Amino acid sequence: IDMRGEHTLLVCCMNLEYYLVENWGTGYGPDNQSEHNKQRAKVSKALAKINADLYGFVEIEQGQSALAELAADLSKNTGRKFSYINDGGSANGSYTKAGYVYCSDVLEPHGSLRYNNEGVDNRKKTQAFREKATGEVFLYSVNHFKAKSGKGSGDNADKGDGQGTYNGDRVREAKSVLNHYGSDSYYYGDEDILIMGDLNAYAMED
């Protein structure tokens, strides 16, 4: 399947469902090395099949090891050079984050990573990239909004209207992304933005 078509860049965003390279057995993600190997093989195969120039991930382990592993797999499996955005953090239990892997043959980072910590920290970020062939710059915002699981109260309660629980939190997160866009676009010096992620928003969402 040709997903690129006539476009010069292909961007992919994916929830990796707790991609952990350590801190196993917490009830989230793999319980051991064998399970991680299976997850890694499936994820890496899927990413190589897509063969995007830029990947945004959510539910990938904090720290740099998980991103480095997938960048190395993409380089090996596609014959192109991939790198990742190092946010300077370290692994902290089974906590996950939003992260970036990009083809350094095609793109280069423009400016530093920007954080939006409305809600859970490390799950909403923006990074600008420059396309080497054209010099064009764009912002890529990767986000993971609050899920519908659990019981909420107040504006987070399930109102029975199809939005499920924690709609209030998701609305606040969505507004925060829009609010951060102004300062992010000023910082990067460019207004073109691509917003992607697991927003946990379905047809009935506000």
Short names for language-model regions:
Residues 1-206:
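Divalent cation-coordinating acidic motifs and surrounding scaffolds
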